[in-house]
């Protein structure tokens, strides 16, 4: 009898949770904001699935753990500038990207297009007149600097000469000698030292055909990654090294062959097993909006949803990498027309242009508010050089037509970014976070005793730090110096605080809210190591 009661209660629990979810949705938000589904029937089914979340193991994300490289301006854009023949089109692309508020360019630096004819040969003799193979990339780097944009350089596409069998194993197959690749990435990183902020080592190594006509190989990729990491850091110790962007896939057919690959969770764990933890600063992942909107909160590791980075974060925490961030290398929804003759129609989902324009800001907003361990998010993609690929589904991720006619998503993202108030959301944020506005004389101090090796310090009275945060409580972790500060929250009365190197709870409220903070140095010194915003006191 007791067993029957237990079984009956077990069956009732999801229904009870389902009822609670319906009530909360009707009172506080729409079902779309919980499920990412637009149609009422699909919303009802999704809410029932959502009620099962508490019965699954939840990812361990450690939201208050300090994370490096997570506080940069998050708005990045994928571009194909190396494929443009006319210089004005490169310039127009970068100009429009910057005008929309994006601050990063993710751009390929193909090995086969730079060290073209043989090892150490950086001359392009494919056309007359011959020219330096660096010329095009020098122009791209200069354009980014001109418009105040940082670069993520993707280092991939080996030349045929790097393999004894040429392209027999595919044009993406790794080189026979990993040191040849190491020499190439060293050449790039040394040439652009201090000018390129970040380097991505390969792309989508967990799916076909990015590892060539052979099964994907996480251990083999890790060896390549570690070689590249060592050589990049030799050339530019300050450069940020990203893994190849892991593709979203639930597949376990390791290839080769179309639509094959290794589940990115498995691939990442096998990378860790092979020693990858010592060989990257940032985990790069692709996070497409495929079958539901980015508001989908169902936790289903067997489904490809926008929430998949939560599981990758869980793996990073389990492997001792909680201090490293995830960057989203490619993110967008596919606005393919309703034409089944288009190659791979429906393979990337299908949304309208209006939905694409709504979903992109929602994706950024969710990551900013809920995932303090996510850094740069790169929209996929700005435009293609021509419309020759309009018979392929992937073409319809574009933001702008080849003739530079903007689509609705361009205006939606421009309005979102330019209207955004940079804000600290719940989590621990480092002293270099993009939402922090320093005024007066501040310096960066390298200190192994700091949380992540550095903090910001002011010594002259009158130096200020201003920012907006959203939450219930705020804690300042200062540097080791002693001094006195004045803290003003919104239009409230300023309060004096003695700073002696210990964390200070600067603010606490009974309920979450949005608050403006101004910290002023009155005397002595003040160091800012981190700021922690709490969702609950």
Q: For the regions a protein language model found, what residue spans apply to each?
A:
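Noncatalytic carbohydrate-binding groove/subsite architecture in carbohydrate-active enzymes
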Residues: 182, 217-354
